[in-house]
C-alpha cells in the first residue's frame, strides 16, 4: 500500500487499497498486450498538496456552517440540525482524506514495522471516512423525510419533528454509521462489503426518487389547501418547497461527486480484468478529488439558498474580527 501510494496512488478505504493493488497488477498484464507505460493504465497522479488544500478548505467551510447554525436561534430547526449533521460528515470525509495523505507521505518507508504502523493508521482513518459516507447518506435521507413531513403534514409537523426527537435520530444515525464503518473496514477483504456499500448508495437514490415523485406531484394540491387557511400558511408552504429544492440540489451534487467512485467499485467487482474498466479505475485519484469537492460545494449551496444563513456567515466572518469596519460600512 505504501509503495503504491509513493507511485501516486492515494487510497481512502482498505477495500480501495485492494482495488489499487489489483488495478496495478491488471494494468501490468494489459500492458503486455500492447499498451504502453504512458497509456491509459498509468495511475493518474495528484499532488498530496491538492488533497491537503481541499481538506483545509472543507474544514473551514463546514466549521463555519456548524458555528452559524449553533449561533443563530432562527436556524434551530430540524432541517438545519440535519444539515449540521451533513456538514460534520462532509468535514470528516475531506479532513480524513487530507490527513491520510499526510500520514502516508510522512511515514512512507520500506521498513516492515513502519509499514505495519502506517496500515493501522490508514485503517483507522478509513473507518472514519466510511462512517462519514454512511452518515452523509443517512443525513440526506433524513432531510428528505423532514421536507416530506413539512409539505404533507404541515399542521402536525411541530408535533412530529420535535427537537428532542431530531436529536435522538441524529445520535442513532452516527452511532449506527460509526459501528457500520468500523465493521466495513474490519471485513473489507470481503467483496460483500463493497456490494453492501453499492447497494446502500442505490437504495438511497431509490428512496429519494420515490419521495420526490410523490412530493412534487402532490405539492401543488397541498399549497392550494394551505392557501385558504388564515395566517401565513401559503408563505410557510412556499418556504418548505424552497427547502425541498435546496435538498434536490444537495442530492444532485452528492450523486455527481460520488457516482464515479461507486462506479469504480462496481467495475472492481464486475470486470477487474476488462481493459476499459481498468482504464476507468486508473483515474481513481480524480474520483477522490470529486468526493472532497462535494464537501466544499455543500456549504456554498447552504449559503446561496438561505438568506438567514448568509447573514449569519457575514456576522461571523466580518463583524467579529472587523467590527469597526462593519459598523462603518453599515453607516454608508
Curated annotation (Swiss-Prot):
Record-listed Ca(2+) binding positions: 100, 122, 126
Disulfide bonds listed in the record: 40-279, 271-277
Outcome recorded upon mutating residue 170 to V: In OBESITY; uncertain significance
Domain of life: Eukaryota
Molecular functions (GO terms): melanocortin receptor activity; melanocyte-stimulating hormone receptor activity; neuropeptide binding; ubiquitin protein ligase binding
Predominant location: membrane
Extracellular side: 1-43, 107-123, 187-191, 272-280
Residues anchoring lipid (S-palmitoyl cysteine): 318
Cytoplasmic topological domain residue ranges: 70-81, 146-165, 216-248, 305-332
Disease (UniProt): Obesity: A condition characterized by an increase of body weight beyond the limitation of skeletal and physical requirements, as the result of excessive accumulation of body fat.
Reported function: Hormone receptor that acts as a key component of the leptin-melanocortin pathway at the intersection of homeostatic maintenance of energetic state. Plays a role in regulating food intake: activation by a stimulating hormone such as anorexigenic alpha-melanocyte stimulating hormone (alpha-MSH) inhibits appetite, whereas binding to a natural antagonist like Agouti-related protein/AGRP promotes appetite. G-protein-coupled receptor that activates conventional Galphas signaling leading to induction of anorexogenic signaling in the hypothalamus to result in negative energy balance.
Subunit architecture: Homodimer; disulfide-linked, also forms higher order oligomers. Interacts with GNAS. Interacts with ATRNL1. Interacts with MGRN1; this interaction competes with GNAS-binding and thus inhibits agonist-induced cAMP production. Interacts with MRAP and MRAP2; these associated factors increase ligand-sensitivity and generation of cAMP.
Listed name of the protein: Melanocortin receptor 4
Originating species: Homo sapiens
Gene name for this UniProt entry: MC4R
